Structure formats: C-alpha cells, structure tokens
Amino acid sequence: MKTSREKLQRRAQRVRTKLRRVAEGRPRLSVSRSHKNISVQIIDDEKGITLASASTLEKEVIASAKSSGNVEAAALVGKAIAERAKKAGVEDVVFDRGGYMFHGRVKALADAAREGGLKF
C-alpha cells in the first residue's frame, strides 16, 4: 500500500510529464503547498535555474495576511510572483500544480497570478 506522500509524488510526476509536452520552452510556475504555508517558483527547466519565487514565509506576506495557510495568503503570494516575474522578464509560463488539486489555495494563487499579468 502506498503512503499519501508516495501518491502525491506519483501525481506530481504525471502532471509534470504532461507539462513537458506542451511547455515549448516556457518556464514552469511550480506550486508547493503544506498545511501552514504555500510557495511558488518560476523555474527555467532548460537552464535549470529559478527565475523568481514567492512564499507565505516572507515578511511582506506575513504582515498583510491574518494566516499563512489560507486562500487570502495564497492570493497575496500569487500577486507577488506576478510582480517578480515581470521584473525577471517573464510573461508566459506553464502552470505546474504538482500533485495538488486545482482548488482552494492553489486556484486562488493561480487566479491572482493571472490578474497580475502572467499568462498560462
């Protein structure tokens, strides 16, 4: 019997395999989620570098959110990553939800990033 962590890793691998087919050189917007926090990175897989990142562990987000593990905080992280992506010169990305459902905090982060100007 597989553990929940192994199931998550298998789902994430399945999602990333599909993303590689459609990426066409675009960087990947990768989401990592825990019970208390959420973080996101824009990764250029061809060069193997992180172009921008944002998290609920940052002082700006902690100061403006009541809690770091809710939908409101995820939306703030989405806005922050959109701003940092613009500074890094990134507009088009491929959204990598990992093994997480596109619902709740993951969806709030994605919607806020789209509102901030990222295209995916």
Swiss-Prot record:
One of its GO terms (biological process) is translation. It comes from Hyphomonas neptunium (strain ATCC 15444). Part of the 50S ribosomal subunit; part of the 5S rRNA/L5/L18/L25 subcomplex. Contacts the 5S and 23S rRNAs. It comes from the Bacteria. The gene is rplR. One of its GO terms (molecular function) is 5S rRNA binding. Belongs to the universal ribosomal protein uL18 family. Pfam families: Ribosomal_L18p. The keyword Ribosomal protein applies. This is one of the proteins that bind and probably mediate the attachment of the 5S RNA into the large ribosomal subunit, where it forms part of the central protuberance. This is Large ribosomal subunit protein uL18. Keywords: Ribonucleoprotein, Ribosomal protein, RNA-binding, rRNA-binding. One of its GO terms (cellular component) is cytosolic large ribosomal subunit. The keyword Ribosomal protein applies.
